[in-house]
Amino acid sequence: MASILELRSRIKSVNSTKKITKAQELIATSRITKAQSRVAAAKPYAEEITKVLSELASASASLDHPLLNERTDPKRAAVLVVTSDRGMCGGYNSNVLKEAEELFQLLRSEGKDPVIYVLGSKGLGYYTFRDRDLGGAWTGFSQDPGYSDAAKASRHLVDLFMAGSGSEVPAPNGEGTIEGVDELHIVYTRFVSMLTQSPEVRRMAPLEVMVSEEHVELGEDMLSNGHGSSNSEPVAGYNFEPEPDKLLGALLPKYISTRIYSSLLDAAASESAARRTAMKAATDNANELVNTLSRQANQARQAQITQEISEIVGGANALASSAGSD
């Protein structure tokens, strides 16, 4: 058994660590509420731009836009992987990176070359350590993303997609050029609840379009949790100026930015929830470890006292025996 001094030193060390994990837990808890509020605040805009684009697509003379049309022979697919800038969030990053690897395998099996783009320092470090080629990376805002952060990534990715494979566009860092792509995908973590966060894969371009007899809708819409726009409500009539085709071309890139921004907000809430869960588990484990070490220290102290008493009694008996023999 370890000595009492060693056990007390370990108890002190664990208590110091527990203070850190408890503080991180409280900070993450406060950030979850803010992140959820931002998700809720962004939802009305996301829903309205989806409705307007659906109306534009319905009023358009044709749906002949690169962001809506499937490429005949897609060769390259850009994948935007959303990770965190900081650690101590349990399996948050490993889960989304695992989901991304599965997507890469699927794309390769379809004959497409995946081009990796990363949001977050953890993802950047993961791929850099493994010597994986990256098309670009954006870091420093995973916990508090702004629309401008999403727009920076969106501008480059839309340019990349509009160029298509075989054409070159400037690299996001301004150094050299990079070949265009035929598909855009995003891998992020969707916030379900405080205890559940689900890694998700979504294709951003070309957008899926569902055409009915009277209406056109954008399919697989993640801006309204996958439910799309509701047909149960009366639809207002629109008079578009300029022509619907021109408006559609102007709004579709903004729609891609909105999808990325919505994913970043979801990921920020998921990151805080995962960090809170991980830090709470660490704090609980620290409490259990302190209790165990305290019990061992008490047992060691009790054994030491018992040994000291035994030595005193033994010495007294020896003295008594020596005095009796004299």
Curated annotation (Swiss-Prot):
It is a peripheral membrane protein. Coiled coil: none annotated. GO terms for molecular function: ATP binding; proton-transporting ATP synthase activity, rotational mechanism. Pfam families: ATP-synt (PF00231). Its main location: membrane. GO terms for biological process: proton motive force-driven plasma membrane ATP synthesis. One of its GO terms (cellular component) is plasma membrane. Keywords: ATP synthesis, Cell membrane, CF(1), Hydrogen ion transport, Ion transport, Membrane, Transport. It is found in: Cell membrane. F-type ATPases have 2 components, CF(1) - the catalytic core - and CF(0) - the membrane proton channel. CF(1) has five subunits: alpha(3), beta(3), gamma(1), delta(1), epsilon(1). CF(0) has three main subunits: a, b and c. Produces ATP from ADP in the presence of a proton gradient across the membrane. The gamma chain is believed to be important in regulating ATPase activity and the flow of protons through the CF(0) complex. Belongs to the ATPase gamma chain family. This is ATP synthase gamma chain. The lineage of its organism: Bacteria, Bacillati, Actinomycetota, Actinomycetes, Mycobacteriales.
